[in-house]
């Protein structure tokens, strides 16, 4: 199963693609879509949508996992983040892909084993789990973490369905 993880942001949207083969997780690609803050916000949303649509067309994931919105101190920032998430989700559902959402705490729990892990701990675990030569860029690392979270969650769901 190929999983696309997305860490949405209005300035940088991270993506991480992994392949789950049995119990193995294999790194496929990761990176970020950068938008220019000088551009009008709708143009930035279009760049997120188009960039993710191209990534979906290239790698053909079977499922998309997106990090859920955190509570921001600034209401305007929270609204922009929500709109960036919307652009990312629409890129997936536009081609019929299922979308699963995970909180930051769920992602940290799945990757490190504790929902209160520090960002550096998560990055080091991703490097180890995916056998990366170096720690991925922050937004890409977060997206890989979301993909890993889904891989673990999907595996658990499949096990539970088999028990019933």
Curated annotation (Swiss-Prot):
Record GO terms (molecular function): crossover junction DNA endonuclease activity; DNA binding; magnesium ion binding
One GO-annotated biological process of the protein: DNA recombination
Keyword check for DNA-binding: yes
Keywords: Cytoplasm, DNA damage, DNA recombination, DNA repair, DNA-binding, Endonuclease, Hydrolase, Magnesium, Metal-binding, Nuclease
Reactions that this protein is recorded to catalyse: Endonucleolytic cleavage at a junction such as a reciprocal single-stranded crossover between two homologous DNA duplexes (Holliday junction)
GO CC, any one term: cytoplasm
Cofactors that this protein relies on: Mg(2+)
Residues reported in the UniProt entry to bind Mg(2+) 2: 67
Record note on cofactor: Binds 2 Mg(2+) ion per subunit.
Top enzyme class: hydrolase
InterPro entries: RNaseH-like_sf (IPR012337), RNaseH_sf (IPR036397), X-over_junc_endoDNase_Mg_BS (IPR020563), X-over_junc_endoDNase_RuvC (IPR002176)
Active site: 7, 67, 139
Keyword DNA repair annotated: yes
Subcellular location per the Swiss-Prot or TrEMBL entry: Cytoplasm
E.C. designation(s): 3.1.21.10
Main location: cytoplasm
Pfam families named among the record's database cross-references: RuvC (PF02075)
Binding site for Mg(2+) 1: 7, 139
Entry function: The RuvA-RuvB-RuvC complex processes Holliday junction (HJ) DNA during genetic recombination and DNA repair. Endonuclease that resolves HJ intermediates. Cleaves cruciform DNA by making single-stranded nicks across the HJ at symmetrical positions within the homologous arms, yielding a 5'-phosphate and a 3'-hydroxyl group; requires a central core of homology in the junction. The consensus cleavage sequence is 5'-(A/T)TT(C/G)-3'. Cleavage occurs on the 3'-side of the TT dinucleotide at the point of strand exchange.
Family: Belongs to the RuvC family.
Assembly: Homodimer which binds Holliday junction (HJ) DNA. The HJ becomes 2-fold symmetrical on binding to RuvC with unstacked arms; it has a different conformation from HJ DNA in complex with RuvA. In the full resolvosome a probable DNA-RuvA(4)-RuvB(12)-RuvC(2) complex forms which resolves the HJ.
NCBIfam families in the cross-refs: PRK00039.2-1, ruvC
HAMAP family with a match to the protein in the record: RuvC (MF_00034)
Protein name: Crossover junction endodeoxyribonuclease RuvC
Gene: ruvC
């Amino acid at each position: 199963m190929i999983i696309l993880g997305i860490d949405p942001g209005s300035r940088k949207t991270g993506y991480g693609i992994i392949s789950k083969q049995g119990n193995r997780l294999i790194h496929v690609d990761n990176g970020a879509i950068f938008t220019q803050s000088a551009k009008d916000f709708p143009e930035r949303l279009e760049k997120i949508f188009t960039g993710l649509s191209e990534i979906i067309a290239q790698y053909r994931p079977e499922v998309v996992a997106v990090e859920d919105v955190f509570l921001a101190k600034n209401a305007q920032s929270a609204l922009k983040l929500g709109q960036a998430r919307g652009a990312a989700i629409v890129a997936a559902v536009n081609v019929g892909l299922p979308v699963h959402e995970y909180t930051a705490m769920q992602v940290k729990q799945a990757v490190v084993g504790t929902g209160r892990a520090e960002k550096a701990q998560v990055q080091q675990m991703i490097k180890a789990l995916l056998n990366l030569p170096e720690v991925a860029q922050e937004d890409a690392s977060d997206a890989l973490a979301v993909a890993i979270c889904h891989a673990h969650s999907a595996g658990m769901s499949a096990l539970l369905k088999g028990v019933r």
